[in-house]
């Protein structure tokens, strides 16, 4: 039997929510190594760092910022279970075509509105989020720029907060993840972004 989110999606009530500001914590840490022989080697390392943090005794968000042209780790940050503030990223000399941000999501799997804000407002070209099993969701910049990106981002952000209020706050995390996956698929092209994930918003049973 197939369960699809799509037919029931329009029943969600649209409620404009103003998000509260949350104090974010982060610490910059040294990479365990920086002698990568290939981009695959670099990604394998970054993925392990992110997933190991989620599966630790006290799960936290670990972020690895990489340059895929040089195959180097530019910086690593650790946060808490909900946030990882990227202090100092705006001062880094980042290659706008080859900088990718990889991080873990201890709470919620899909790319978040904060992740989308990062890719829209920094030289980062891709943001990848992992869950505890190493499954990913990815958002990347496209060449064509879209007008009214700020308006579209705001629509996306509000819809994400609606889903959190409707589902996540009630413990419906699996449905919430699938709903947010669908919402980003809808809004990403309108923001000039490409979105991919390897977990589906349609659950087969």
What do the predicted segments below correspond to?
Residues 74-123, 131-132:
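Short HxH-centered metal-ligating active-site micro-motif
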Residues 15-23, 27, 124-205:
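Divalent-metal-activated hydrolytic enzyme cores
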Residues 1-19:
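Non-Sec secretion/translocation targeting segments of pathogen effectors
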